[in-house]
Amino acid sequence: MNFTTLAKERYSCRKISSRPIESEKLEAIKQAAIAAPTAHNFQPVKVWLIQSPEALEKIKSVTQQKFLHTSPACFIVGSNAGQGWVREEDSMNFADVDASIVATHIMLSIQDEGLATTWIGNFSPEK
């Protein structure tokens, strides 16, 4: 599939299958995350692949998204501002931008593997 088609076909899916994801597909997705660029190659991003039922239950408990309850896996992308590149002119820290780039690589790779995603930003940080 070419990139333009991939980008156009990717959407936020609300009907998540509980079917396990093949390890080859997960490896390809991980490689796409690793290949994502970061500002000045500082790499302030960390990615967690959550698959255990116990860990998935914890993830589900902090979000209001009911469709997530059938998901067999979840990628969590975070950044460490202390490790991000900071632009001198205005002190903008690029750690969150870098995390967004990595997350986008993950989502597009998932789509390329014939799977579906949704971006979840609505969660309880306190939990």
Language-model features and meaning:
Residues 1-127:
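Acidic, surface-exposed loops and disordered segments
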